[in-house]
């Protein structure tokens, strides 16, 4: 095990919105250190989202943040071994981990989608998440369902 907890890295805000959350998302989206490409994908996806939801009074960034909130899980199950049996113990998730899980799920399910470009797939997944639909939202619902089903083992807290 580690001796000390590692220091959090300082993440700079993105150039367009000045938001650290956007940079964190783009870092998850990025392949092979190609951050500019990842930023282009993200910004074009947000433009497409605004085009798909023209009568929405929110900005594209607010829609993206609302979509992330919709797919953010509150509880997860962790395996815990007690006397030869393994139990799925529901535990609350730390705020930074919640954010990380929701971002990763949005990207994973966007990549699995059918579509021409990654920007199109990402925008479609953002719109679905905003409307409480799609693969990422279903993943959150499944996590909550698993935690609810295993609530009897909550006393095995970590």
Curated annotation (Swiss-Prot):
Pfam families (alphabetical): Ribosomal_S7
Entry-linked InterPro entries: Ribosomal_uS7, Ribosomal_uS7_bac/org-type, Ribosomal_uS7_dom, Ribosomal_uS7_dom_sf
Molecular function per GO: rRNA binding; structural constituent of ribosome; tRNA binding
Gene Ontology biological-process annotations: translation
Keywords from the named record: Ribonucleoprotein, Ribosomal protein, RNA-binding, rRNA-binding, tRNA-binding
SUPFAM superfamilies, sorted: Ribosomal protein S7
Gene3D superfamilies: Ribosomal protein S7 domain (1.10.455.10)
GO CC term (a single one): small ribosomal subunit
Subunit relationships: Part of the 30S ribosomal subunit. Contacts proteins S9 and S11.
Family stated for the protein in its record: Belongs to the universal ribosomal protein uS7 family.
Task of the protein: One of the primary rRNA binding proteins, it binds directly to 16S rRNA where it nucleates assembly of the head domain of the 30S subunit. Is located at the subunit interface close to the decoding center, probably blocks exit of the E-site tRNA.
Name of protein: Small ribosomal subunit protein uS7
Species in which this protein is naturally found: Parabacteroides distasonis (strain ATCC 8503 / DSM 20701 / CIP 104284 / JCM 5825 / NCTC 11152)
